[in-house]
A protein has these predicted regions:
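PP2C/PPM-type serine/threonine phosphatase catalytic domain
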Residues: 1-301, 305-321, 328-332
Length: 336
């Protein structure tokens, strides 16, 4: 059985208190080696304490530490989503309890409250967890695509306040999304002290200028935000995906659930970059086609599930497992 390639990720990060005496931002990353990277992936976490509280820096540090430590202690049988959400939910409850036991129990704006944004990359999938107004971006060409929603409530006079954060209530809603990643993809996590004073194009330009030194790029972004007049703490993290690992069985099933079943194919039809030559086999379970790669003429065989089984989720999961198993077979008697 061939040894699967491990996920390779680089992380650059920097934080500065700026004009404030205390840095209420907190950030961290965990890039484990070997089996743990394969089973749990790489985690990058950012939290921002609220300015009205003198203990929100404690909350931010606790939130980051909890996710970076406790996530890796959850069962390998759990999905990334279940593992991280359980940890964040427990942290939220703990922070809320700390406020209830403190002198600030009647004024939550002075309690153990912070925002949180986390990026966990496992295999070939990025998982995003988010509460508050810190942000996660994906670098898209010369600009940034914002992947998270700011949980802020805007008032008629133009002011706004934080609408959701960790520690405010005993339970909180945690935004989650996942997306496929590939080698060359890059993500940026930032606190509002940065993204409210740095246009997306300037962030991308700083990364390009200092490449491949991501720490230098992060320092440059923070410094520019402060020079642009940011009055807040400034923190940025840059995540570069250098190599993705093959998806495990649970990831492939998760990805499968987001795809539509292909229709019945016919000769000369284009499908996923190939041209169908003819049908080789058909049954109530699946269809098998001979196809060629335009430009090279290379022949391939494509197998698709029958549309008659599109509601049979268990069958579709088993269908996906065929590819997962085939990748792990290394035999001269098996066609690859």
């Amino acid at each position: 059985m061939p040894t699967p390639a491990l996920l390779q990720v680089r992380v650059g990060q920097h934080s500065d208190a700026g004009r404030k005496s205390v840095n209420q931002d907190f950030h961290g990353a965990c890039l484990p080696d070997g089996p743990q990277r394969q089973s749990k992936g790489v985690a990058v976490v950012l939290a921002d304490g609220i300015g009205s509280s003198d203990v929100s820096d404690v909350a931010a540090a606790a939130a980051v530490h909890a996710l970076l430590v406790d996530y890796y202690c959850t069962s390998d049988a759990w999905s990334v989503k279940r593992s991280a959400q359980c940890v964040v939910a427990a942290t939220n409850s703990w922070l809320h309890a700390q406020t209830r036991r403190s002198p600030y129990r009647f004024d939550q704006d002075r309690g153990y409250v912070c925002t949180l944004s986390a990026l966990i990359v496992k295999g070939a999938t990025a998982h995003l967890f988010h509460v508050g107004d810190t942000r996660i971006y994906r670098v898209q060409g010369r600009t940034l695509e914002q992947l998270t929603e700011d949980h802020r409530v805007c008032m008629t006079d133009g002011r706004s306040y934080l609408g959701r954060a960790l520690g405010v209530q005993p339970q909180t809603e945690i935004d989650y999304r996942s997306l496929p990643v590939d080698a060359g993809d890059m993500f940026v996590l930032s606190t509002d002290g940065v993204h409210e004073h740095m246009p997306p194009g300037a962030i991308v330009q700083a990364i390009a200028t200092h490449a491949p030194d991501l720490d230098a790029a992060a320092r440059s972004i923070v410094q520019q935000a402060l020079e642009n007049g940011s009055p807040d703490n400034c923190t940025v993290q840059i995540v570069a995906i250098d190599r993705v690992a093959p998806a495990d069985a649970s990831e492939m099933q998760h990805q499968r659930a987001q795809l539509r079943l292909p229709p019945v194919l016919s000769a000369r039809q284009q499908f996923e970059g190939y041209e169908i030559v003819r049908e080789l086999y058909t049954s109530h379970r699946s269809h098998v086609y001979l196809a060629t790669e335009p430009g090279t003429g290379r022949q391939v065989v494509i197998k698709t599930p029958s549309i008659d089984r599109q509601e049979d989720q268990a069958f579709l999961d088993r269908f996906v497992l065929e590819e997962w198993i085939a990748r792990r077979i290394d035999s001269p008697h098996v066609l690859r």
